[in-house]
Design a protein with these regions (language model features):
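Cofactor-binding active-site loop characterized by glycine-rich and histidine/acidic residues
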Residues: 52-55, 59-207, 225-242, 504-506
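Glycine-rich ThDP/TPP pyrophosphate-binding loop and its adjacent helix/strand module
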Residues: 144-342, 346, 515-642, 646-647
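Active-site nucleophile and cofactor-binding loops and adjacent substrate-binding regions
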Residues: 67-75, 96-97, 134-155, 249-254, ...
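A glycine-rich helix N-cap at a beta->alpha junction
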Residues: 118-124, 205-214, 429-432, 476-494
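Conserved acidic/glycine
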Residues: 1-78, 84-86, 279-425, 435, ...
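Glycine/charged-rich beta-loop-alpha catalytic/anionic-binding loops adjacent to active sites
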Residues: 59-64, 128-148, 178-184, 242-246, ...
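Alpha-helix C-terminal capping segments
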Residues: 80-88, 159-170, 202-210, 239-240, ...
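Acidic, glycine-rich active-site loops and adjacent beta-strand->loop/helix elements
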Residues: 96-101, 187-193, 215-221, 252-255, ...
Length: 714
């Protein structure tokens, strides 16, 4: 008896299979027990659907090639084996070649074609992103967060989902289901050479997270073959990650794939630990519609011998399914796919105005509330105002947790910005991470998706760069590219700025880079009261927020920054984003020229100290948030005083401040008596550690006074 017959016998003798009704035009999970014969017929219907769609897309390439796409041809067996077994409480992150996973969970060909043709009713993105880039939030389907094109990008967010599941279980706020949820991350083998994928594996192994990694290995990158791009395959590579069990299988054998997936899912649901399936498969179609297989491959004939559809057809024959029944299935599928394609072509396209929907989720915080300066309190340093804000939030909200490098019990942050929190709330809610900025940032996508509010920290702004890939590709775009389904509710704390001989790797300002990432909000407070109020607002805002916290203001140790210490606001104090603060009012009645200084962060104190040298001629506006920006307040002040300095700690050229100056010039041109001046650091690659050199590079009060004098005389 051959292997497939042996498996069939085992199935018939007692291994019941939870399966689906394969009326392909509707969601097919009916949660009923069925025979292996019915399972195989159902799988064949779906697998033939995937092939028919691939063939149709090729036949109609004059239409379908308008938007780039890839299909699962050759990968169908393992993908269907996975998709058909997932439950509504599960999360799955398919990648761009995984349309068979989508068919397996119940997405119809028509819905997939709406995305292929970028139609308005594309259920995933409303015509905003590519074919087989799903995002799904339906009650009776497995959930799918926004998926991007960057190889391996889904590994960190999906591992964040698993981390969130475990956290909720550990502190008792999960749904307490009989069958616990799992996270599934699908990857191509070539993507596993990405460093961020290793960060995800590291955390899954370290924390023993309930996640299944499915790695589909077709031995191709695009045109690069396996021997060009990897030192070992994923099975060998995973030997370095203690705690992730790996199964290696023939991913073209549906029965073996189904059994393996079933067993792995059972283990993860029950034992809550990570597993990886390494499925070896052929790529039978093009890399994408724009990179055709015949251009560079010489293995196509050999790969065709491992076609999973042919193997499944043979298994049906071995299991006594008549050819006439199979042919009937094929005819039904062909008619359905053709009809769905014709209907999808006729579907409505998005309107131009649809492009502006879902850039940000609506925020509940629209006005300042609470007591900013309660009676009977003494001034509190800025770092403690942040600490107290987070403490109050964690006391009130079990979904709040804090993690990052060195924020845990022993240290509480290198600036003591998280001191006492781990002791008070426990090391499940406040914990250290490895040195993995990408994971720290990107995991918040998954944590947010399961209903948590992660507050995370990058230790210095200088070290945010490894996290920018996740911030830009996943965090900032999730709400927009999921067409409003998946906002990422998170706070990213970033200690920033120079604080006295910090040197080139502990003094940087990075706000201009961040301000060019659309879809995130950016706060940059200059006082303890503002830091606490904005931290609270950030928590209740459903969008991602970057909180830039100036290290030189944390303790007010730098001369002239004493005013950063403020009375700590009460627990209910909140400040809406996009509302600037007037630090110094100027209403000159003596006919002297006046000017306004628009600034933020440390610039508030350079400006405040410089203004003392002038007799009621300076108005100072503290932006407080850089995105959104309070343009109305800025323009109002500039139009009142007719002269303006935009003051920043960053180098001037190509900076946020220079961009703001251009906006001021454009909107206030008729009111200006002088060019808008930008004052900032010198345009050099880094801030030197030597104090003499540092002083030369950075702006300060004395340099600002000179610029003010010149502008007032203009």
């Amino acid at each position: 008896m051959n292997k497939s017959h042996s498996i069939i016998q085992t199935e018939n003798n007692g291994l019941n299979v939870k399966c689906l009704n394969m009326e392909i035009t509707q969601k097919h999970f009916l949660n009923k027990e069925t025979s292996l014969t019915d399972l195989l017929k159902s799988a064949y219907r779906l697998m033939f659907t995937a092939k028919t769609m691939t063939d149709l897309f090729e036949q109609e390439k004059k239409i379908t090639s308008k938007y780039v796409h890839a299909t699962s041809r050759g990968h169908e067996a393992i993908q269907l084996a996975l998709g058909m077994q997932l439950l509504p409480q599960d999360f799955v992150s398919p990648y761009y070649r995984d349309d068979s996973i989508l068919l397996g969970v119940g997405i119809t060909p028509y819905e997939l074609m709406l995305q292929l043709l970028a139609k308005k009713d594309d259920p995933f993105s409303g015509g905003r992103t590519y074919y087989s880039h799903p995002s799904l939030r339906r009650d009776d389907f497995p959930k799918m967060i926004h998926q991007s094109s960057g190889t391996g990008m889904q590994a960190i967010p999906t591992t964040g989902i698993a981390m969130g599941m475990k956290y909720k279980e550990e502190i008792g706020i999960d749904d307490n289901l009989d069958e616990k949820p799992i996270a599934v991350c699908s990857l191509g083998d070539a993507s596993c050479t990405e460093g961020e994928v290793s960060e995800a594996f590291q955390m899954a192994a370290l924390k023993q997270l309930p996640i299944l990694y499915l790695v589909q290995d077709n031995e191709w990158d695009i045109s690069a073959s396996a021997d060009e791009i990897r030192a070992q395959d994923i099975t060998q590579y995973m030997q370095g990650f203690n705690g992730i069990e790996t199964r290696t299988i023939d991913g073209t054998d549906f029965i073996k794939s189904y059994e393996t997936v079933k067993e792995c899912i059972r283990i993860i649901r029950e034992e809550r630990r990570p597993m990886l399936i390494h499925a070896k498969v052929p790529l039978l179609n093009h890399h994408t519609s724009g990179v055709r297989k015949e251009w560079y491959r010489d293995d196509l004939e050999e790969c065709a011998k491992n076609d999973p559809l042919i193997k499944l057809r043979n298994q049906l024959s071995e299991f006594s399914v008549e050819d006439s029944e199979v042919e009937s299935i094929e005819k039904e599928v062909q008619n359905l796919v053709r009809t769905d394609f014709e209907n999808a072509i006729l579907a409505e396209d998005p309107k131009p105005e649809d492009a502006y929907k879902h850039d940000f989720a609506p925020t509940p915080i629209t006005e300042e509330k609470g007591e900013r300066s309660p009676n009977g309190k003494i001034p509190t340093v800025m770092v403690d105002c942040a600490l107290f804000a987070i403490r109050e939030l964690m006391q009130k909200h079990p979904e709040a947790l804090l993690y990052g490098q060195d924020v845990g019990l022993r240290l509480g942050g290198v600036f003591r910005e998280a001191i006492t929190l781990a002791a008070q709330f426990g090391e499940k809610r406040v914990f250290n991470t490895p040195i993995q900025e990408a994971f720290i940032v990107g995991s918040t996508v998954g944590m947010s998706a399961v209903g948590l509010k992660p507050i995370v920290e990058v230790q210095f702004a200088d070290y945010i760069w490894p996290g920018l890939n996740q911030l830009f590709t996943e965090v900032s775009r999730s709400y927009y590219l999921s067409n409003g389904k998946w906002p990422v509710s998170m706070i990213l704390r970033v200690p920033i700025g120079a604080y006295g001989s910090g040197g080139p790797y502990h003094s940087s300002s990075v706000e201009s880079v961040l301000c060019n990432i659309k879809g995130i909000k950016i706060a940059y407070p200059s006082t303890g009261a503002d830091l606490k109020g904005l931290m609270k607002t950030a928590f209740y805002d459903p969008n991602p927020v970057v909180m830039l916290e100036h290290k030189g203001l944390y303790w007010s140790k730098i001369e002239g920054t004493e005013a950063a210490k403020t009375i700590e606001p009460d627990e209910d104090y909140i400040i809406p984003f996009g509302k600037a603060r007037e630090v110094l009012h100027c209403d000159n009645q003596k006919g002297k020229p006046t000017l306004t200084i628009i600034t933020y962060g440390m610039g508030v104190y350079w400006a405040s100290n410089a203004a003392k040298q002038f007799d009621n001629q300076i108005e100072i506006i503290d932006l407080r948030t850089l995105a959104p920006l309070d343009e109305n307040r800025v323009f109002e002040s500039v139009k009142k005083h007719n002269r303006c300095i935009v003051l920043t700690e960053e180098p001037v050229n190509n900076s946020f401040a220079q961009s703001l100056a251009a906006r001021i010039s454009e909107n206030c041109f008729r009111h200006l008596d002088a060019p808008v001046k930008v004052v900032g650091a010198k345009d050099l690659p880094a801030i030197p550690i030597n104090s003499i050199l540092e002083k030369e590079v950075l702006p300060n009060t004395e340099k600002l006074i000179t610029e003010i004098e010149q502008l007032l005389k203009y």
